[in-house]
């Protein structure tokens, strides 16, 4: 089997994470005997693929059609693997193309693509490099660290008031509350339940885009969850790294708290900071049936983890091997429980990550899926 990995366009590469994933997966393919190479998204891409055809192309977050509506997979007649590691709302158009194989990092995301018509969908959680080493430093350089975009909930709600009818606003507010109160409900399902209970009809939506509504809903959920966590630290010092998509950022929204706000940093620095920290705070309330790579990075390095609810993590690691701040009366108790977690348990979850959640494992799982899919 031969798979060509295509780097994302520069404007979508973010802080280097997609490029890093691409190189890690390419290395993993080589280690399991799959022929692969990395290609730039240049003007020569199509001719390169036609001249030396792989069995599949692969790109993190997929390749959408060009401005003229043409799909790369159709132009070169090669199936495309769209490995979605960000919110699915931006990429649901991929479900329309039958030559796309869609990989998602959350089972809820997979179900959403299937509802939009995708026929070939594979669930593979985030992963880490096998080279991550268990450090568990006695005197780490950083205390607790948090990485994440700042979402100003008030700004989101003001945009709803400006752009949506009262009924649509009520549906979105109710959906956000439902998704935050019941961590087993995926935000799309919360939206559908809320729309049904409020009697919202397709006619009332008019020309409103469902993916745009879902993205706005997800942003509100993420914003509320992150502010709940970071505003309830009660003196626990935390270094917060992240940009804002609104006028107000972390510095203004967390003024008076015990956090130290930093600019967003590139992915290589994120990994380095995690390994030099006491622990990682993780707020990903829209990933309920999967896991973010920050969690695996922290576990593999032997540092602490306090995270939002994840059914997947509970099933993988059990409730006594990491701590969820929604489980306890306050985030402080989750901090204390995680800091008191024994070194043997931290070593155990490190071994579990290295055994089950590396890029080599994901490469093996993806190849196994593709072989079954071809039959």
Residue ranges and their predicted role:
Residues 60-74:
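An aromatic- and histidine-rich active-site surface loop
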């Amino acid at each position: 089997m031969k798979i060509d990995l295509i780097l994302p366009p520069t404007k979508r590469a973010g802080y280097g994470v997609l490029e890093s994933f691409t190189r890690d997966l390419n290395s993993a393919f080589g280690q399991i005997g799959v022929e692969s190479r990395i290609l730039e998204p240049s003007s020569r891409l199509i001719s390169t693929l036609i001249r030396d055809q792989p069995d599949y192309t692969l790109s993190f977050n997929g390749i959408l059609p060009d401005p003229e509506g043409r799909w790369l997979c159709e132009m070169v007649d090669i199936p495309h693997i769209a490995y979605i590691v960000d919110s699915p709302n931006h990429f649901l158009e991929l479900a329309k193309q039958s030559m796309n194989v869609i990989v998602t990092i959350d089972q809820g995301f997979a179900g959403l693509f299937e509802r939009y018509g995708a026929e070939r969908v594979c669930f593979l959680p985030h992963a880490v490099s096998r080279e991550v080493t268990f450090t568990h430093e006695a005197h780490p350089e950083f205390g607790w660290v948090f990485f994440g975009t700042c979402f100003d909930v008030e700004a989101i709600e003001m945009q709803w008031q400006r752009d949506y009818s009262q009924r649509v606003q009520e549906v979105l507010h109710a959906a956000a509350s439902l998704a935050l109160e019941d961590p087993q409900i995926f935000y799309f399902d919360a939206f559908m339940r809320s729309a049904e209970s409020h009697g919202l009809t397709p006619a009332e939506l008019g020309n409103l885009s469902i993916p745009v509504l879902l993205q706005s809903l997800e942003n509100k959920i993420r914003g509320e969850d992150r502010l709940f966590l970071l505003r309830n630290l009660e003196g626990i010092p935390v270094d917060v790294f992240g940009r804002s998509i609104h006028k107000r950022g972390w510095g203004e929204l967390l003024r008076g708290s015990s956090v130290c706000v930093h600019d967003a940093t590139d992915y290589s620095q994120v990994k380095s900071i995690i390994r030099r920290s006491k622990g990682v705070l993780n707020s990903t309330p829209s990933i309920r049936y999967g896991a973010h790579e920050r969690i695996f990075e922290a576990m593999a390095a032997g540092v602490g983890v306090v995270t939002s609810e994840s059914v997947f993590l509970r099933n993988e690691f059990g409730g006594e091997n990491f701590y969820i701040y929604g489980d306890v009366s306050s985030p402080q108790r989750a901090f204390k429980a995680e800091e008191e977690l024994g070194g043997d348990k931290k070593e155990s979850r490190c071994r579990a990550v290295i055994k089950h959640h590396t890029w080599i494992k994901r490469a093996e799982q993806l190849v196994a899926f593709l072989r079954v899919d071809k039959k």
